[in-house]
Regions:
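Active-site histidine-anchored catalytic micro-motif
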Residues: 1-135
């Protein structure tokens, strides 16, 4: 499968955001694609992919805090027996993928943007995929 990359992460926190931008940059270089798109995909129902600010670590903290306020980890009204309903809601809100434009061998991101793998039900070993398409 040309230009499909699989990556593994060992997540040791219950809820966290891992910057995966450099990994994706390396995939683009390895692919040799100069113009096209890159899709970053998370195949898990309690994790997601987002693009957000990279300059202030407080942004990551605040995102996790905000998701926890919206979808608390502990809620006696949840019915899902595994106890991770909050993580399913957070990942559904976050989304499972992001698509970016590749131009001149680099993807286009805003000045303060990076790509994050978002874990809401750790600790776990996780995978994500990067698909690079020329054109």
């Amino acid at each position: 499968m040309g230009n499909l990359f699989k990556h593994s992460l060992s997540i040791r926190s219950r809820q966290t955001m891992v910057d995966i931008t450099k990994i994706i940059e390396e995939d683009i270089i390895q692919s040799g694609v100069k113009d096209g798109i890159v899709v970053v995909y998370c195949p898990h129902t309690t994790a997601g992919i987002t693009i957000n600010e990279n300059a202030a670590p407080d942004v990551v903290h605040d995102l996790i805090y905000g998701f926890e306020k919206a979808y608390p980890t502990e809620d006696k009204n949840y019915r899902h027996f595994e106890g991770n309903s909050h993580a399913h809601m957070k990942s559904s809100t976050m989304g499972a993928s992001q698509t970016l434009i590749i131009s001149e061998g680099k993807f286009i991101l805003g000045r303060w943007q990076d790509i994050y793998f978002c874990e809401f039900d750790g600790s776990r070993n996780r995978n994500f995929f990067v698909k690079i398409i020329s054109g």
